[in-house]
Amino acid sequence: RAAVSRDFVVGARINGNDFVEGGNDLAACTEIAKYLEPYVDYFNVSCGVYASAPTMIEPCYSPEGWRKNLAKTIKAAVNVPVIAVNTIKHPETAERFLQEGVSDFVGMSRMQLADPDVVKKAMAGREDLIRKCLGCMNCNKSVVAGKNLHCAINPVTGRATVYGDENLVKTGAGRTVAVVGGGPGGMQAALLLKKRGYYPVIFESRDHLGGSAVLASKAPCKGMVAELIETMKAEMKEYHIEVRLNTPA
């Protein structure tokens, strides 16, 4: 703190619980926050260490907002703003936690990977178009492997200089392209084609979109897959993409 001026913002990322035997629990982490408070302008509260990795970067079976008590407890003990990550996947959950005093700001890192426009869409009342993080850990897997950051449901993540909307080469000129299959891959292909100026037509032999992902969404802890299907169906309507159900290609 002494190395910078008072108007230079200094924050601290701290745990609310290490979730390992012999580590810092919530009480200890709260005391650490109180000790650091005079030296920082805000706290960013997370939890877990590598020995308790599923609490640090939660997979699909972790309930949304499961650790809210950690940030709320620390927030009540200090007088500087608290940012909290909380496995937030829905804008209304983020807003509710703000109203409940869980934190002053909400961190939604993986949601930003899944859909960088999540806040813009929420403000416009278009939650139906928000692609919500599945908790599939694909992003973490790519980083651990030393590769570029990628997202299973947003092919633009890590490739924006090529596939970002502003960089797409629009050479379609209205030409019709048949897309065989209305699963997530088919719908994503149709969406990209539409943005490039083509006229995609999805041919789906079944009476619904979603492909094998519909079955996958029935498995335990896979409810977010069902939400992804509904979001992509909404995208098909938003971009006026023609869909022919019960029509084998």
Language-model features, listed with the residues they occupy:
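Flavin-dependent oxidoreductase catalytic cores
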Residues: R1-V180, P184, Q188-P200, H208
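Beta1-alpha1 glycine-rich phosphate/pyrophosphate-binding loop at the start
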Residues: A178-N246
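Phosphate-bearing ligand-interacting subdomains
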Residues: A249
